[in-house]
Amino acid sequence: MRRLLATTMMLLMTTAALAGCAGSDVTQDDVDAAYDNGYAAGTADAASVSTLDTIIARGALKCGVKDSQFGMGYLNADGTYSGLDIEYCKAVAAAIGIDSIEYILATGSNRFELLASAEIDVLIRTTTWTTSRDAGLNADFAGMNFYDGQGMLVNLDQFTEATSALDLDGANICVGIGTTTEGNLLDYYELHNMQMTTINTENAAAAQENFLDGSCGVWTGDMSAMVARMWGLRDEGMNLAIMPELLSKEPLGAATRDNDDDWNDVVAWVWYGMITAEEFGIDGSNYGDFVNSENPGINRLLNSNLGLGTDANPLSDTWMQAVLGAVGNYYDAYDRSFCDGDGEMANCLINRAGTLNALVSEGGIQYAPPMR
């Protein structure tokens, strides 16, 4: 929290300096107090060092993730993590030549504080890119690895006739604290002149407990999460259904701290590289066949630094080969996260075909800017 306050103070001080004679609520006493407490100096020092350089010096990447959503961020019984967000973390680590990853649990309510205080290097935790988060939380968003929308999981024993979200008037609804889901839910119910009671929960475990004991008859969150929850509750003997409506747009992606452009560029272009590789038909098993390609686009992808990194720690020319060796392309990562992982996109918890998460060439919106 101190680091968060320090960052805020530094931004206010900078604003005051730029404002000059226009005036400011920040006084010289505030500035002196900040330096006396070490806030401003510490923030200034931190701002001058790229997170990438810090990671390389440390020898480990600290990735803020979920641990309870199958398909995105999930802690398995054997202690390993899996999911599309985890694949993204692994890809970033491979790109910068780091073997060690520390997965740090980030909740809906503390994730941006963890990021601002530098307790994590990057947040990859089903986090929706919104205006207020981008502008107000000093977060800089990078690659969007999953396009989602808000769904509603319903206990049909409480709502026996429900076939639509419009049938859920008067519901007790479990919703995560500190999520865009809260605001979307309020907007939807107000728009349709419906009544509901929110049961705010700190995490998925608390929400599931309330859902199982009947405290809430509806559980709302990202549709990907609701599908995963329904799958996880398949042996509970409950009569469940997901309503067909999507209450919102939820572009989920990675976030770094503001004013850390070199690091943000790396995080973003790792994702774009995975998409570009799939577009070229290059995956985790065949990329070696393309390293001497005469195709200029492929050659740049597999054998060029592309200006990424810092002066002290530029990415290697073969950084994308390292990514492909670690996690493969976007198709590979999705297949392992949501499907059987056999390379055929079979038996998927959430199909990619026909959704926004398909490549543009296949009717979706996953698309990479030119890598040149």
Model region roles, listed by residue range:
Residues M1-D45:
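Secretory targeting signatures
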Residues G38, G42-R58:
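Bacterial Sec-exported substrate-binding components of ABC uptake systems
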Residues V49, I56-R125, Y330, L359:
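Extracytoplasmic small-molecule ligand-binding "clamshell" domains
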Residues K62-G71, G79-A95, D148-A206:
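Bilobed "Venus flytrap"/periplasmic-binding protein-like clamshell domains
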Residues K90, A94, I101-D167, S224-L246, ...:
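Acidic, polar ligand-binding/catalytic clefts
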Residues V92, L115-A116, L168, A207-L212, ...:
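Hydrophobic residues within well-ordered alpha-helices
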Residues A94-A95, L156-F159, N172, T179, ...:
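Extended ligand-binding regions for polar small-molecule ligands
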Residues L308-R372:
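C-terminal functional modules
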